[in-house]
Amino acid sequence: MWFVMREEEPEPRTMMPETIPWKLLQGIALVQLYREEKWVEPPELDRLPYSLLYHQTMSTLASTGELTPAELAQRVLTLSYFHRVSADDYRALLRHLIKIDHIQVTEGGGLIVGLAGERIINNFKFYAVFQENEEFTVRSESAELGTIVNPPPPGERIAIAGHCWIVEEVDWKRHTVFATQVKGRVPAYFGDCPGDINTHVLERMRKALNEHAVYPYLMGNARARLAQARHTTEISGAGTKPLINLGGDTWVLFPWLGSYAFLALERMLKIKCAAELGLRGLDPSRPYFMQFKMKADEETFFEVLAAEAEKDFDPIELVYPGEVPYFDRYDEYVPEELVRKGFAEGVLDIEGMKQRVLSWRDHA
């Protein structure tokens, strides 16, 4: 087996963070963690899987026929993967499914599959619970720009038709993305959930940059790129300092956090810290680094972040107003308040983010 990491030649004006071979480091980290610790990424068992809850509810009704709400809850909520789902959450889901006719109430008060639900469960793809790649049409005003799969949420940028566009709205029912042209480049968008990377991998990537070990499985070009990256890291201090000034008011933050802790930090910066820090133009390359412009100095940055991390805030505060972050297959049939709750409390790694932020106090 071979890992092949393809890279574009960096342009002369490329900023330091973009010259580091992140995918190469990630590959090294995965191999080393298995060689040293026999470590593989653990399953995530503490999420709020409302999309899967919908699927299990509909498949249970389809296979058993009429059930009372209590009988249905007894069959579904006792499954170990739903241990964090409360009775109130399940009640909200059932009421919503009755409202949209995916479930129907019989004269005797029992529950059966509704007419709209029949169309879903009779589709041959119903039992494929994982999200599939579906094409979305991208439009700007009256013009059709092309198609993409798995669109990013509003506020993210995409590259299509030779230009950079910011996503304004995603119509999940019509499979349409509405976008506006903007200047600039497009940072890598890795999605909010699929293909997530554990914090342990990022920490091993940092160690690979800071140590001088030679990995015998690397080919010549990979060894050369690693040596170059280690030299860049040593000169810039990126391996030991989380915040680096790139000149003027431009900064880069290396959190060395996994996908969901990184996403939580990004949102805390934008929602809770941006005004006090004079922070703007935050440009993430998840989950490796984020660049931004900031009026505050380094000491103030760490002080403000630590102050926010010490607060016991509600996770839902890190979800933007009006945002409904769909990313699982059946999220569109789940009540919006549960989709938001599932993302805030089941996806974002707020505790992991807080621990890392508070560990930066020595840099303040």
Task: Label the model's feature ranges.
Residues A222-R223, A227-T233, G239-K272, F292:
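C-terminal helical accessory/scaffold domains
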Residues F3, N133, D171-N245, E298-A364:
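Terminal, basic amphipathic appendages of nucleotide-handling enzymes
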Residues E9-P10, E144-T147, P187, L253-L265, ...:
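Short, surface-exposed beta-strand/loop "edge" segments at domain boundaries and coil↔beta transitions
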Residues M1-L45:
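Conserved segment of the helicase C-terminal RecA-like domain
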Residues K38-C164, V170, N245-Y260, K272-S285:
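C-terminal accessory/connector segments of nucleic-acid motor ATPases
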Residues V4-E7, L30-E37, T60-T64, L79, ...:
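Conserved, well-folded catalytic cores of nucleic-acid-processing
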Residues L111, H175-T180, R280-E303:
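A generic structural motif
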Residues P17, P21-I28, S51-Y54, A87, ...:
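Amphipathic alpha-helical transducer elements in NTP-driven molecular machines
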